């Protein structure tokens, strides 16, 4: 048992001999230095380096020639942090051995990659901002030209009426008159005047003379019957049941004759329709100021507008 313990205790130096044979006892282990270098930059530190955004939503303000642009503390602080982190994290005892420099080579390459990426983004944002400043500076450097920018559409001095050519309205609204009766022949004056339809309830209710006759002589019932019995959508028999020019004239008149036996008020429709035509003609003759001649010549009569004279008493 003692021999095995001695042989077992003597086996440990034999196992450690090939592993520690090429290094002195006072030198540090390069693998320990590598594990220390791996933890130089953590994820929070990398995020802290790239947490600022130098891009702006609007155009940058052009600095005046008399004033110097203020330094950007965020950019300087960023570069200080980029260059300061690897320096503070380096242990001082690793600067005197080649083993430590070979172990630090891949780590420094990763740090330089991060710093070069941040520098490239900073360079891109700086170049974009400088190009915007050059564009804005060239536009604002003109001086009086920039002050004379037109912001409101200029108005023409001429009135719209002066640009229009002479038309019929320039000669006068009622310049064209009939040669026989001497009345105006414009469309407004020669249009026939219908009977008023809003003459009750202070012009709030529509009650035309035609509707009064239709409901008073029960023709509205005939129109409703023809409307429901008609198969053609384009058939206007319901609108003019007594018309002789439309289709199915004999059928309509026969149906109205049969219905007049039950509705004797239908016999009053034709006399009431004649009275309506007579009243319409009388009302139109009184209220229409234009010409009612069928065949007549048109004469243009323009009376020049002369300003009134001021008759002063002689002194």
UniProtKB/Swiss-Prot annotation:
Subcellular localization, as worded in the UniProt entry: Cytoplasm, Cytoskeleton; Cell projection, Ruffle membrane
Entry-linked PROSITE patterns: SPR
Domain SPR: 177-291
Chain segments carrying region Required for interaction with CAV1: 118-315
Composition bias type Polar residues, residue spans: 1-15
Annotated site residue numbers, Cleavage: 144-145
Pfam families per record: Sprouty (PF05210)
Region (Required for interaction with TESK1): 178-315
Chain positions covered by the region annotation Disordered: 1-140
Keyword match Plastid: no
GO cellular component: cytosol; microtubule; ruffle membrane
Domain of life: Eukaryota
PTM info: Cleaved at Pro-144 by the prolyl endopeptidase FAP (seprase) activity (in vitro).
GO biological process terms held by the UniProt record: animal organ development; negative regulation of epithelial to mesenchymal transition; negative regulation of ERK1 and ERK2 cascade; negative regulation of fibroblast growth factor receptor signaling pathway; negative regulation of lens fiber cell differentiation; negative regulation of protein ubiquitination; negative regulation of Ras protein signal transduction; negative regulation of transforming growth factor beta receptor signaling pathway
Keywords assigned by UniProt, alphabetized: Cell membrane, Cell projection, Cytoplasm, Cytoskeleton, Developmental protein, Membrane, Microtubule
Comp. bias (Low complexity): 108-140
Basic and acidic residues: compositionally biased ranges: 20-32
Entry comment, domain topic: The Cys-rich domain is responsible for the localization of the protein to the membrane ruffles.
Function (record text): Antagonist of fibroblast growth factor (FGF) pathways via inhibition of FGF-mediated phosphorylation of ERK1/2. Thereby acts as an antagonist of FGF-induced lens retinal fiber differentiation, may inhibit limb bud outgrowth and may negatively modulate respiratory organogenesis. Inhibits TGFB-induced epithelial-to-mesenchymal transition in retinal lens epithelial cells. Inhibits CBL/C-CBL-mediated EGFR ubiquitination.
Subunit record text: Forms heterodimers with SPRY1. Forms a tripartite complex containing GAB1, METTL13 and SPRY2. Within the complex interacts with METTL13. Interacts with RAF1. Interacts (via C-terminus) with TESK1 (via C-terminus); the interaction disrupts SPRY2 interaction with GRB2, potentially via disruption of SPRY2 serine dephosphorylation. Interacts with PPP2R1A/PP2A-A and PPP2CA/PP2A-C; the interaction with PPP2CA/PP2A-C is inhibited by interaction with TESK1, possibly by vesicular sequestration of SPRY2.
Protein name: Protein sprouty homolog 2
Biological source species: Chlorocebus aethiops (Green monkey)
Lineage: Eukaryota, Metazoa, Chordata, Craniata, Vertebrata
């Amino acid at each position: 048992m003692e021999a095995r313990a001695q042989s077992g205790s003597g086996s440990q130096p034999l196992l450690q001999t090939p592993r520690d044979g090429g290094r002195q006892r006072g030198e540090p282990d390069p693998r320990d230095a590598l594990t220390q270098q791996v933890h130089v930059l953590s994820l929070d530190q990398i995020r802290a380096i790239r947490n600022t955004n130098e891009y702006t939503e609007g155009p940058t303000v052009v600095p005046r020639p008399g004033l110097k642009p203020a330094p950007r503390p965020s950019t300087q602080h960023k570069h200080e942090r980029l260059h300061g982190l690897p320096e503070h994290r380096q242990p001082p005892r690793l600067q005197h051995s080649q083993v430590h420099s070979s172990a630090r080579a891949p780590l420094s390459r990763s740090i330089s990659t991060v710093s070069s990426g941040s520098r490239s983004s900073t360079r891109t944002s700086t170049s974009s901002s400088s190009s915007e400043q050059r564009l804005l500076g060239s536009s604002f450097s003109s001086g009086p030209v920039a002050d004379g920018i037109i912001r409101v559409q200029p108005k023409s001095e001429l009135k719209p009426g002066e640009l229009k050519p002479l038309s019929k309205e320039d000669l006068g609204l009622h310049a064209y008159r009939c040669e026989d009766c001497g009345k105006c022949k414009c469309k407004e004056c020669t249009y026939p005047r219908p009977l008023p339809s809003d003459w009750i309830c202070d012009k709030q209710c529509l009650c035309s003379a035609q509707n009064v006759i239709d409901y008073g002589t029960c023709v509205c019932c005939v129109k409703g019957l023809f409307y429901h019995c008609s198969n053609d959508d384009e058939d206007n028999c319901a609108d003019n049941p007594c018309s002789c020019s439309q289709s199915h004239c004999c059928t309509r008149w026969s149906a109205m004759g049969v219905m007049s036996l039950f509705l004797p008020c239908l016999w009053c429709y034709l006399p009431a329709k004649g009275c309506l035509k007579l009243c319409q003609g009388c009302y139109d003759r009184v209220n229409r100021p234009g010409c009612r001649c069928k065949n007549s010549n048109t004469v243009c009569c323009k009376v020049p507008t002369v300003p009134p004279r001021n008759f002063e008493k002689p002194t």
